[in-house]
Amino acid sequence: MKILYVEDNDDNVYMLKNRLSRAGFTVVIATNGAQGIAMANSEQPDLILMDLTLPDIDGEEATRRLKGDPATKHIPVLALTANAMSADRERAIAAGCDDFDTKPVDMPRLLEKIAALKIE
Protein backbone atom coordinates (compact mmCIF):
# COMPACT_ATOMS: atom_id res chain seq x y z
CA MET A 1 0.00 0.00 0.00
CA LYS A 2 1.36 3.41 -0.99
CA ILE A 3 0.79 6.36 1.35
CA LEU A 4 1.40 9.99 0.43
CA TYR A 5 2.33 11.91 3.58
CA VAL A 6 1.94 15.69 3.18
CA GLU A 7 3.87 17.30 6.04
CA ASP A 8 6.25 20.27 6.31
CA ASN A 9 7.89 19.37 9.65
CA ASP A 10 11.07 17.35 9.05
CA ASP A 11 10.94 15.65 12.46
CA ASN A 12 7.36 14.49 11.90
CA VAL A 13 8.25 13.24 8.41
CA TYR A 14 11.26 11.28 9.67
CA MET A 15 9.39 9.70 12.57
CA LEU A 16 6.18 8.72 10.81
CA LYS A 17 7.79 7.65 7.53
CA ASN A 18 10.06 5.26 9.42
CA ARG A 19 7.23 3.85 11.51
CA LEU A 20 4.95 3.37 8.51
CA SER A 21 7.76 1.81 6.47
CA ARG A 22 8.45 -0.68 9.28
CA ALA A 23 4.72 -1.51 9.23
CA GLY A 24 5.04 -2.47 5.56
CA PHE A 25 3.83 0.67 3.78
CA THR A 26 5.53 2.48 0.92
CA VAL A 27 5.65 6.16 1.89
CA VAL A 28 6.19 9.12 -0.43
CA ILE A 29 6.56 12.63 0.96
CA ALA A 30 5.30 16.05 -0.08
CA THR A 31 6.37 19.05 2.01
CA ASN A 32 3.60 21.49 1.07
CA GLY A 33 0.05 21.54 -0.24
CA ALA A 34 0.88 22.28 -3.87
CA GLN A 35 3.43 19.48 -3.98
CA GLY A 36 0.92 17.17 -2.28
CA ILE A 37 -1.69 17.86 -4.96
CA ALA A 38 0.85 17.27 -7.74
CA MET A 39 2.14 14.06 -6.16
CA ALA A 40 -1.36 12.73 -5.56
CA ASN A 41 -1.91 13.02 -9.32
CA SER A 42 1.44 11.54 -10.34
CA GLU A 43 1.81 8.85 -7.65
CA GLN A 44 -1.87 7.83 -7.29
CA PRO A 45 -1.36 6.67 -3.69
CA ASP A 46 -3.79 4.39 -1.88
CA LEU A 47 -4.12 6.89 0.97
CA ILE A 48 -3.09 10.47 1.79
CA LEU A 49 -2.06 11.57 5.28
CA MET A 50 -2.58 15.33 5.22
CA ASP A 51 -1.17 17.80 7.73
CA LEU A 52 -3.69 20.62 8.03
CA THR A 53 -1.16 23.37 8.74
CA LEU A 54 1.04 23.76 5.67
CA PRO A 55 3.08 26.76 4.51
CA ASP A 56 1.42 27.45 1.15
CA ILE A 57 -1.92 25.78 0.53
CA ASP A 58 -3.27 24.52 3.86
CA GLY A 59 -4.40 20.93 4.23
CA GLU A 60 -8.09 21.79 4.11
CA GLU A 61 -7.76 23.63 0.80
CA ALA A 62 -5.47 20.93 -0.63
CA THR A 63 -8.08 18.32 0.33
CA ARG A 64 -10.88 20.34 -1.30
CA ARG A 65 -8.87 20.48 -4.52
CA LEU A 66 -8.05 16.77 -4.40
CA LYS A 67 -11.68 15.81 -3.79
CA GLY A 68 -12.78 18.12 -6.62
CA ASP A 69 -10.44 16.47 -9.13
CA PRO A 70 -11.78 13.35 -10.90
CA ALA A 71 -8.24 11.90 -10.95
CA THR A 72 -7.82 12.05 -7.15
CA LYS A 73 -11.29 12.26 -5.60
CA HIS A 74 -11.32 8.51 -4.89
CA ILE A 75 -8.18 8.63 -2.70
CA PRO A 76 -8.99 8.60 1.03
CA VAL A 77 -7.54 11.54 2.98
CA LEU A 78 -6.78 11.23 6.67
CA ALA A 79 -6.10 14.60 8.31
CA LEU A 80 -3.29 14.80 10.86
CA THR A 81 -3.02 17.84 13.10
CA ALA A 82 -1.81 18.98 16.49
CA ASN A 83 -5.16 20.80 16.86
CA ALA A 84 -7.47 18.48 18.78
CA MET A 85 -10.58 20.64 19.10
CA SER A 86 -13.87 19.29 17.72
CA ALA A 87 -14.18 22.37 15.48
CA ASP A 88 -10.88 21.40 13.80
CA ARG A 89 -12.22 17.92 13.11
CA GLU A 90 -15.48 19.33 11.74
CA ARG A 91 -13.62 21.70 9.38
CA ALA A 92 -11.40 18.88 8.12
CA ILE A 93 -14.37 16.60 7.46
CA ALA A 94 -16.25 19.48 5.78
CA ALA A 95 -13.22 20.03 3.51
CA GLY A 96 -13.48 16.41 2.36
CA CYS A 97 -11.16 14.53 4.71
CA ASP A 98 -12.36 10.98 5.26
CA ASP A 99 -11.02 10.80 8.82
CA PHE A 100 -9.06 12.83 11.34
CA ASP A 101 -6.32 12.07 13.86
CA THR A 102 -4.18 14.13 16.17
CA LYS A 103 -0.44 14.52 16.65
CA PRO A 104 1.56 13.25 18.31
CA VAL A 105 0.55 10.12 16.47
CA ASP A 106 -0.65 7.10 18.42
CA MET A 107 0.59 4.41 16.01
CA PRO A 108 -1.88 1.61 16.88
CA ARG A 109 -4.80 4.04 16.51
CA LEU A 110 -3.43 5.40 13.22
CA LEU A 111 -3.00 1.88 11.83
CA GLU A 112 -6.61 1.10 12.76
CA LYS A 113 -7.79 4.25 10.97
CA ILE A 114 -5.71 3.39 7.89
CA ALA A 115 -7.17 -0.13 7.81
CA ALA A 116 -10.71 1.21 8.19
CA LEU A 117 -10.28 3.65 5.30
CA LYS A 118 -9.01 0.92 3.01
CA ILE A 119 -11.93 -1.39 3.87
CA GLU A 120 -14.63 1.17 3.03
Spans of features found by a protein language model:
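C-terminal output helix
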Residues: 105-114
